[in-house]
């Protein structure tokens, strides 16, 4: 019998690298690993949680698991995501172990699933995650308020419930539903360009649409999830509604506002959160530009939201931890200080493009830069862990992405860089906390 522990860091990464290179030996070996995984041979291993006295890592790996299963079994995207929850969960958990990521984190094609529930026409490529058909929007300005609450007991919601049941069964971690936030859901079913046009020309309509989606889709789905899984969590995702795409002021007054109004702002005691607003540097840059314009006679308008206010409003919809994503482009020290000020742990992201082998022009330079960045991230995470009121379990039971977080890994990720980054995690001394 294959022992999954024999592929602990960095051996699993070396296997992934050989598989990626296309060697027949590696393909046969990785097939034997996944044969065993899907048969349930590793289920006991999956119940081992990340150590509570260490800085750990998490990763979104569903695209990498799809690439492997498509290569070794010919499993298509639709089959992978929608037909066998045990295969799906075991494959994703196995990929996490091969990578050397100690905190398990279950993800799927959440933007696609969220709009497919409503009847949006989808595209399912064989080897890649699904997406909405951009040429056939589900709703428009004339009919958007006719959208009603879907049935959460069947179809995509049931598929997700089954994945979460299996994940909880195998890992013991609390179930985490991942769905689109109102703005990103609107972008997928209304169309990015029409929605952006209305952001500029008809903001009242946009806010009414976001509230309608929240009331008819998001809130009922949250309530369904928490009824099925009373210990559950909900991660809303809103990349399209981020400061980088629609600006800090619109992010505040539209995207985040539509979440803040849910559950009177309590967000089910913080168990509903959105941690993926990206592009914080936009607020920082625009704030500096505003100060420089004060000495000029320009009457042009500028954002009213600076980096500190943006952080405040992001915290209002992600109350349990502080997130710094790669696209934020703000020094990690700022997020370290914000975490300490708010007495919450810090998560720092490694962007998918940073470790994409097709995007890296100079691998040695990338190794140097990412190695140094990862060292800074791990140092900041450890400092926060040692200074805040951290529970004894270090939140390893909670299902959110924590500590060093690979935002998306796939079949084109440069596994040598992943190994280099994770070395900083593995080399980090244990967390030292004062004892009473």
Language-model features: locations:
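Short alpha-helix boundary/capping motifs
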Residues: 123-125, 195-196
